[in-house]
Amino acid sequence: MKSSNKKKQINATLIDYGEGIFAIDSGYIRKEFAAIHLVVERNKVAVIDTGTNFSVANVLEALKTLNLTKHSVEWIFLTHIHLDHAGGAGKLMSVFPTARLAVHSRGVKHMINPKKLWDAVINVYGLKTALQQYGEIIPIPGDKIVEVGAGD
C-alpha cells in the first residue's frame, strides 16, 4: 500500500491520516494536547488509548462521523495505564459490548480493580481535581481483558 502524507481535518476533534488511521482529540487539559487513535479496516475498529471518561463522547462522535457502530469496535489497546491514556477504558468497555481490552500484564490488575491506581491519583491531585480531570475510574471485568507482555 502506498502511504499518503496528507492529513485531513474532518471536524474539530477528528483527523484522518489516511489508510484507516484516525486521531481523535481527547479533550484532555486543552485542545490538541492528547489524542486517541482509531485503526479502521473493513468496518472493524481498534481504539488505541482511551483518554479519560470525558473523552468517551468524542470517541462516540468520531465513530458516528465515520458511519461505524459500537459493535464495530473489536479491540481497545492501552499503551500504558496513566489516566490520561487509560482512564476512560472502563467507560468505553461498557459502551462497546463485543470489545476486548489489551493491556500490559502489569496493568491488568489495575483495570480489574482500579482502587490502588485511583487512590494514588487522589493522593497526588486531591479528590476534587482527580474527579474534574479524569472522572471516577470504572473497573473492567477480567474476562474482557487480554494480558500482553514483551514481544506480544
Identify the role of each PLM range:
Residues 11-66:
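Conserved beta-strand hairpin/beta-sheet module of binuclear metal-dependent hydrolase folds
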Residues 22, 102, 145-148:
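General small-molecule cofactor/ligand-binding pocket signal
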Residues 35, 58, 88, 113-114:
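Residues at alpha-helix caps and immediate loop-helix transition turns in enzyme cores, especially N-
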Residues 57-103:
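Active-site metal-binding motif and surrounding structural segment of the metallo-beta-lactamase
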Residues 106-110:
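Short histidine/acidic/glycine/proline-rich micro-motifs that form metal-
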Residues 1-15:
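Basic/polar N-terminal segments that are highly enriched at the extreme N-terminus
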Residues 111-152:
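Metallo-beta-lactamase
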